[in-house]
Regions:
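Active-site-proximal loop/helix of nucleotide/amide-processing enzymes and allied scaffolds
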Residues: 1-4, 22, 26, 36-131
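Long amphipathic N-terminal alpha/beta scaffold segment
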Residues: 1-31
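Non-Sec secretion/translocation targeting segments of pathogen effectors
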Residues: 134-136
């Protein structure tokens, strides 16, 4: 399962890291990238960097995963804001955000598995904000 895969990659790290995984139309991982700032409390990735990543790799979908090296896998307010911002960036680029997984000292947290991903997808979707298609 994907949570076990990212846990094996992120749990051993001493600093917080974010990984983005490009998913193709057949729901297979095609590419992954790790972002890290060497900080135990946060990793900062600018929206422009994620936009470039999406434009370069053109995935059908995306899974985000990051770790809390010294704390439980409980999403913080900053994690919720990041997930909402990432969903909006994905929506603007016609990419489906499948999940955001947090790896902590007590296991993993999946926005998808607890049912929050669909709510975030609906709330932070460009079509919902502007009322559908843009027509001249």
């Amino acid at each position: 399962d994907f949570s076990e895969f990212v846990s094996a990659r992120l749990a051993p790290l001493d600093c917080e890291a974010l990984e983005l995984f490009c998913i193709d139309a057949n729901e297979r991982i095609r590419f992954g990238k790790r972002f890290s700032a060497g900080d135990t409390q946060r990793v900062r990735v600018e929206p422009e960097e994620i936009s470039r990543f999406l434009a370069t790799h053109r995935p059908a979908g995306l899974v985000a995963a990051h770790n809390h090296p010294d704390s439980p896998a409980v999403p913080s307010d900053a994690d919720d804001r990041f997930t909402a911002q990432l969903q909006m960036l994905c929506s603007l680029n016609n990419v489906r955000l499948y999940d955001h997984i947090i790896v902590g000292t007590d296991g993993t947290y999946s926005y998808f598995l607890v049912g929050r991903m669909e709510e975030i997808r609906r709330a932070f979707n460009v079509n919902n904000l502007i009322g559908g298609r843009i027509c001249p």
